[in-house]
Amino acid sequence: MALNLTRLLLSVLVFGASLGIFIPASFSEEEEKVLDVQVYLTKKQAFEIAFPGADKVDREKKWLTKEQKKAIGDLCLQNIKTNRVTFYVGKRDGVPMGYAIIDHEIGKSFPITFMVVLNVDGSVRDVEILVYREPRGWEVRYPSFMDQFTGKNADTDYRIINSITGATLSVRAMVKGVSRATAAYKVLYLSGKP
């Protein structure tokens, strides 16, 4: 039965192509470009940037309660679906230097993997793209865009972040990701509740 269905679909595709309809050229071009995944940083390289001089990086997995998910969502204006958040804590002589979260957010069609580095007070110190999978919008990795996040925190109105022509969806993805990271940090580390 599966073979008959495959033959039927192939026949429809061939017939549609012979009429000059049904198969847009941009689809195949888009698919070819998607295979060009850009890995900018490994996790190890990202931690070296996030925590220069650290003698240790600890991983802290935080399981979220319903109340924490709601609080994070209220701060970043998003529906939080995940049940766990993982923070990485860079330490020197046992003292936290800062925190980082590695997360993913969908650009146009594919996830952008990024790291948000936070100071102990919850303000953004750095944002780095680790892996970019979209054919367009890669300009979000440039310092001229990323530096806009420096100093922002969970109370920031992220609508002040300037967009990039031709990279609107990637910009939105990064804004969502950074605002979610700062909100999670505020709720989990600064709220005074365990």
Walk through the language-model features, giving the residues of each.
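Bacterial N-terminal signal peptides
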Residues: 11-21
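Flexible, solvent-exposed loop/hinge segments and secondary-structure transition points
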Residues: 26-164, 168-172, 176-194
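Bacterial N-terminal signal peptides that target proteins for export
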Residues: 1-12
